[in-house]
Design a protein with these regions (language model features):
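N-proximal low-complexity "stem/linker" segments adjacent to membrane-targeting elements
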Residues: 1-14
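Short loop->beta transition adjacent to catalytic acidic/histidine clusters or analogous donor-positioning motifs
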Residues: 2-4, 26-34
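Short, well-formed alpha-helical segments that are part of the catalytic scaffolds
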Residues: 13-26
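Active-site-proximal specificity loops/subdomain of glycosyltransferases
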Residues: 36-86
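Conserved catalytic core of nucleotide-sugar-dependent glycosyltransferases
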Residues: 98-181
Length: 230
């Protein structure tokens, strides 16, 4: 069962604080680790990530979108793993994820899975995904291209994240200028794992766009993106 939650964030605004406290409230027996990039206003005791040459870089994407860090949130996950390689599993939640129940109440037996994400992009549906279309023709030849999205509601067992991180570090330049969620899904498939969701309508709770979810505080769940106080 999951004991460790990675809380990815970039500021200490009111919504971040609200959602961080709710995650801790509804999961009192779990460790919640705040994680963020350097040069940001982070929560106390955060794991601070410094980008390194040993990691992929998204300089082209970041310049296109005017943000130095937005497209490479996956680096937070790999870096945290490298500093904490002995946890049994890693459950990732972003700062704009609202919850009103425990992980067990929401995910149930899915927490015993090797990995899951709320939306998956495989060879069956990836061609129309925006971040896939942004790849160069050469990048599209990379084997096992896939995507998981958003970077919240993700589960990785230790062995899974270990293999992904090892493959990434073995050839970081191969993964330059790939959007983080594309890099995550590709690494998962390259390591031999199937992209899976925790349950059939998981995209109604956690998605990349608020208009795609059914946000109902009377129903127990984890919801993303929630960028306002509730």
């Amino acid at each position: 069962m999951v004991s460790d939650i990675l809380f990815l964030h970039c500021s200490t605004n009111d919504v971040t604080l609200q959602n961080y406290e709710l995650i801790k409230k509804y999961n009192p027996t779990k460790n919640v680790y705040p994680i963020g990039f350097e040069n940001h206003d982070l929560l106390d005791d955060s794991h601070i990530v410094v980008r390194k040459q040993e990691y992929p870089n998204n300089h082209v994407l970041n310049e296109m979108y005017g943000n130095k860090y937005w497209s490479e949130a996956d680096l937070l996950i790999y870096d945290f793993y490298l500093h904490n390689p002995n946890l049994s599993s890693y459950l990732v939640l972003e700062w704009d994820t609202y919850c009103n129940c425990s992980l067990e109440s929401f995910y149930g037996e899915s927490l015993y899975s090797d990995t899951f994400s709320h939306i998956i992009h495989t060879e069956c549906n990836i061609n129309d995904w925006y971040w896939y279309t942004m790849l160069t023709d050469e990048q599209k030849l990379i084997p096992s291209i896939g995507g998981i999205t958003p970077t919240s509601g993700l589960l990785f067992k230790n062995v899974v994240l270990s293999q992904m991180t090892e493959k990434l570090l073995a050839n970081p330049r191969c993964y330059d200028n790939m959007f983080s969620e594309l890099r995550l899904g590709t690494l998962l498939q390259q390591c031999g794992y199937k992209l899976t969701t925790p349950f059939s309508d998981s995209d109604k709770y956690i998605s990349w766009d608020f208009d795609n979810i059914v946000f109902d505080t009377s129903q127990s769940g984890y919801y993303h993106p929630i960028k306002t106080l509730v």
